[in-house]
Amino acid sequence: MLGDGNEGISTIPGFNQIQFEGFCRFIDQGLTEELYKFPKIEDTDQEIEFQLFVETYQLVEPLIKERDAVYESLTYSSELYVSAGLIWKNSRDMQEQTIFIGNIPLMNSLGTSIVNGIYRIVINQILQSPGIYYRSELDHNGISVYTGTIISDWGGRSELEIDRKARIWARVSRKQKISILVLSSAMGLNLREILENVCYPEIFLSFLSDKERKKIGSKENAILEFYQQFACVSGDPVFSESLCKELQKKFFQQRCELGRIGRRNMNRRLNLDIPQNNTFLLPRDILAAADHLIGLKFGMGALDDMNHLKNKRIRSVADLLQDQFGLALVRLENVVRGTICGAIRHKLIPTPQNLVTSTPLTTTYESFFGLHPLSQVLDRTNPLTQIVHGRKLSYLGPGGLTGRTASFRIRDIHPSHYGRICPIDTSEGINVGLIGSLAIHARIGHWGSLESPFYEISERSTGVRMLYLSPGRDEYYMVAAGNSLALNRDIQEEQVVPARYRQEFLTIAWEQVHLRSIFPFQYFSIGASLIPFIEHNDANRALMSSNMQRQAVPLSRSEKCIVGTGLERQAALDSGALAIAEREGRVVYTNTDKILLAGNGDILSIPLVIYQRSNKNTCMHQKLQVPRGKCIKKGQILADGAATVGGELALGKNVLVAYMPWEGYNSEDAVLISERLVYEDIYTSFHIRKYEIQTHVTSQGPEKVTNEIPHLEAHLLRNLDKNGIVMLGSWVETGDILVGKLTPQVVKESSYAPEDRLLRAILGIQVSTSKETCLKLPIGGRGRVIDVRWIQKRGGSSYNPETIRVYISQKREIKVGDKVAGRHGNKGIISKILPRQDMPYLQDGRSVDMVFNPLGVPSRMNVGQIFECSLGLAGSLLDRHYRIAPFDERYEQEASRKLVFSELYEASKQTANPWVFEPEYPGKSRIFDGRTGNPFEQPVIIGKPYILKLIHQVDDKIHGRSSGHYALVTQQPLRGRAKQGGQRVGEMEVWALEGFGVAHILQEMLTYKSDHIRARQEVLGTTIIGGTIPNPEDAPESFRLLVRELRSLALELNHFLVSEKNFQINRKEA
């Protein structure tokens, strides 16, 4: 809870609130809105009428639990039931039944849905808000051309433009444009009504020629002219009803439906008073837009900033789910209409239940969650990742932008983002600036705008009132920046503070301020606000840090950070990783998998997560924190989760670090570490991998799971039980059988081996006709079997095969090639693990755990790591933890440096270690070489920063290939570890080998090991029988491919081979 004095007090909102509120809004409002749109359906003879009674719909609570849905690959959904009636008009009889419409996937309290056993999350999308926008562009003559763009609710665009002669045109496509008079006339106005409803009738009359008068003489002529231009039809089309319907469908419905938000924006921009329920573009809108365009031409009015957030809207999870529900009801309407007609045709008596099927709704939502670009698999690497993922904002997706066409201006930070979209946290690469993150206090308003809270400062009232303002409203206030205001002291009236007014940043006196920010870093996202001393870092490095914190692996023994920002507890609470008491009571029983809580006369069982696999193969595990018999209050923490300690987020470890070069082993961001981190399991993490196999019913019979697998060595089957499935607790190595399976196959007599035929002829022994298709442990999968799941098929259909899943836990210590990072964008790869006696050591004898390169700090400008490093050392010596809000320079100049030095000085006094703070070089100390015992020449910065181990681990990346698959076209090895591929020797690698003069190695690289088919086969034969490998003679396959591709362009390329022996030239055909 945060406050300014005792007046303005606010709590940080729940980090999952955006997603959860959106889903609740869909259930409360969106469902009924779409159900009310469902029309009454009649048969062709209009004898039977079908309709839904929306008032009595109900959602049924799911029968399965979330955890079971994940393990059994099911969808955690609720069944939707609606009352429907079938009315016979002749007899006025009505049959009413409650029918099952379909399943709607539910959202849990963390803002995620479970679809087919997979956690999925729907990302909020930023779109251009429907309405009209005016802008100015220079033509090829350097003259300003003013245009007004009308954007519909579905994203369709139409433009109005004014030329040098003040003529106004409506551009309905890129090439075609028509007069504004023709468009208005086609929409139903005559010339007199047009002139009466505009402010500048003389300008409209000035470009009205005789030809133009003829076009707008009647509505039919105007529609024909409009259709001819819009559809690019040559000749003279004839007016008809079908022509009007086509025009209505292709133009007016797609480009003229403004929607609720568009109507509001249009009324505000053009000062209209058209009712909100009139959501289509009217002739009055067109004429008012044309008047405004003429005003701009003559210097009146203002242009629009398309990138301002007041001109954007958020398409939340509620809107997306409502759109899909409406689409499903349209499909259901078509099904019901066809079923009624079919029943009447076959003289059957229909009932509401017979007419309705649940397939449209269920399949629509399954395809939405599975295929829609804004529905993503939830990233569950660590608790922080889960809550950050749901707060993303994307410009991409249907109706949005693409990574290749978005301009720099759209990607850039805008002043209206203040307090709404984080200026730091975005993705790296092609989508930079297109995928952002919500600021901590931001919320989605009623009209789809992003709102940010402010404290109102009024002379009349002594209290402080909190307001949520949309992007367009806070422009007209003087807003004091929160990073310049103290949290717990009164602001002096004569103080001069930085403020924001109309997208400009000013410095004004305190009495001129209207609003103030409520929190020093309310304009940061969760990831960025977990970075201590972020104000001392370059923004690019802060961006990397906020991304890399989401890649941190939960460690087996987590540790709180000594230096933090204070948001660690809130992040852990909202992540769902903790087990929290839902009510008061007393703990009567505890176990590793559940807690029993007694209170209010009954007992509540709280299950715990035990060695659960995330979709990034990290281990999610809860550790009990309350003893048996303890009295618990509501909201108290019962168990810590993965990467949490004491209810706070704990992604890494506080380790002793020195910034110094060491024999070149930490150059170019490499990191030197001590073996203590390995042997004491400092950076040890557990990873759980899932392996699965299915049993099908083939045309030759069902596949069989058994432990009797012929022709396999016994030690590969040693871990199987009597059913042929690996036993729990077994230690398995690469190549071991996890599930024994035999697939039946038809074998001809001629395909039997001679010894098999002999056994059948003499002894009558039946030789196996099954093929071994066992599940084997792949390379790098060694570990302990912790769980086995046999999911039986439902309904007995061969399309629903049985699935056997085996979960194997791996213990991974830190090793050379793993990636580690700090919280300031300082990342590196482990280059060498030194014995602890060889590491540099301090004056008290402690050896350093990590050695970083000091050259990685000044050029990257992330000095915050130095402050954290030194303050962490003081905290470890004083046994203190610090929670520091960013921008502490609001209290005084050099506040961060003074805090660090004062804490180091105090630590030096209390521990009687003068080397902790030496006035000649504060923060540095003289340390000693562990190999020689001699001190290093220069004092070195030492400290205890918080270092994370990232998920980019060498065990998942290391790869070697001796033989493997080849591409069919180029005959070169495939690419990638998953395909057992090889490394490409490119042009620069060839130059390097040429520079060393290694001709034979270079020839091997370009022929045997690459795409020379004949040479590859000769190598294999020569290796088996022995002898010298012959040199390849003809051209490799890639050259032959080039010749064939040139032939497709009608270019013939002849090539010749020159013999090494007699220099004879032989022509070769490709």
UniProtKB/Swiss-Prot annotation:
Keyword set, alphabetical order: Chloroplast, DNA-directed RNA polymerase, Nucleotidyltransferase, Plastid, Transcription, Transferase
Keyword Nucleotide-binding attributed: no
The protein's name in its UniProt record: DNA-directed RNA polymerase subunit beta
Record's subunit section: In plastids the minimal PEP RNA polymerase catalytic core is composed of four subunits: alpha, beta, beta', and beta''. When a (nuclear-encoded) sigma factor is associated with the core the holoenzyme is formed, which can initiate transcription.
PANTHER family attached to this UniProt entry: DNA-DIRECTED RNA POLYMERASE I SUBUNIT 2
Upper lineage: Eukaryota, Viridiplantae, Streptophyta, Embryophyta, Tracheophyta
Function: DNA-dependent RNA polymerase catalyzes the transcription of DNA into RNA using the four ribonucleoside triphosphates as substrates.
Gene Ontology molecular-function annotations: DNA binding; DNA-directed RNA polymerase activity; ribonucleoside binding
Domain of life: Eukaryota
Family annotation (InterPro entries): DNA-dir_RNA_pol_bsu_ext_1_sf, DNA-dir_RNA_pol_su2, DNA-dir_RNAP_su2_dom, DNA-dir_RNAP_su2_hyb_sf, RNA_pol_bsu_bac, RNA_pol_bsu_CS, RNA_pol_Rpb2_2, RNA_pol_Rpb2_2_sf
Residues in coiled coil: none
Tagged with keyword Chloroplast: yes
